[in-house]
């Protein structure tokens, strides 16, 4: 299921899944009733400069609708990732660091007001100028490389509240520390 616009969820828009055909994202989530839901949404909606107030209003409504539909779910809302400096200048002005800082601060406030956990991916992925570090970016300047995805997974595993049911989280007997990962990677 792919939907990068909060209004797709709020307006119950049908999306096409390659595996399941047409579906409405909110209905899929309601049927699944997940214990946890990780949300990373907004990059495509923000590519071009536009009405930030409208985007944030839909984001707030999306979180409210999700909370009502999934009352027992823990929500982990991730910040909107930046693009590389070259891509922002060439074709993605809407992902400028100053704009994303305002958007992400507003999303963080929405999370605080609604009891959602906010995860600041930019702290890990942005350079000093607030742009996506090129070492983690595909040539398009937006999508992550394999090392970027690995860093993302590691961040998620180490930046959520401890949960005994999550075996890959720090504190779990199954979690591999960086020292252990390095030791295992040296084995032929």
Where are these regions (language model features)?
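Conserved SGNH/GDSL esterase-like catalytic core that processes O-acyl groups on lipids
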Residues: 1-60
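Low-complexity, flexible helical/coil segments
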Residues: 4-6, 71-77, 112, 152-159
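Short, flexible active-site loop motifs that bind/organize anionic cofactors or intermediates
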Residues: 27, 65, 139
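N-terminal cationic-hydrophobic initiation segments that often serve targeting/anchoring roles
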Residues: 29, 66-68, 108-111
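Loop/turn elements at helix/coil->beta-strand transitions in domains of secreted/extracellular proteins
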Residues: 32-37, 70-75, 113-117
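Active-site segments of SGNH/GDSL-like serine hydrolases
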Residues: 38-46, 64-101, 123
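Generic structural signal for well-ordered alpha-helices
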Residues: 59-64, 104
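Catalytic His-Asp segment of secreted/periplasmic serine-dependent ester chemistry enzymes
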Residues: 82-188
């Amino acid at each position: 299921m792919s939907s990068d616009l909060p209004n797709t969820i709020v307006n119950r828009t049908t999306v096409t899944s390659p595996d399941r055909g047409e579906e409405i994202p909110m209905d899929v989530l309601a049927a699944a009733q997940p214990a946890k839901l990780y949300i990373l949404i907004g990059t495509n909606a923000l590519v071009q400069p536009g009405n930030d107030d409208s985007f944030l209003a839909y984001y707030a409504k999306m979180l409210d609708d999700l909370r009502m539909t999934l009352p027992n779910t823990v929500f982990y809302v991730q910040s909107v990732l930046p693009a590389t400096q070259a891509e922002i200048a060439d074709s993605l002005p809407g992902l400028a660091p100053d704009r994303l800082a305002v958007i992400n601060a507003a999303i963080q406030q929405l999370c605080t007001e609604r009891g959602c956990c906010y995860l600041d991916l930019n702290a890990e992925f942005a350079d000093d100028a607030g742009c996506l570090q090129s070492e983690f970016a595909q040539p398009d300047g937006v999508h992550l490389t394999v090392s970027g995805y690995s860093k993302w997974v590691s961040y998620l595993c180490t930046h959520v509240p401890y949960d005994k049911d999550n075996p890959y989280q720090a504190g779990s007997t199954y979690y591999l520390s960086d020292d252990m990962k390095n030791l295992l990677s040296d084995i032929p």
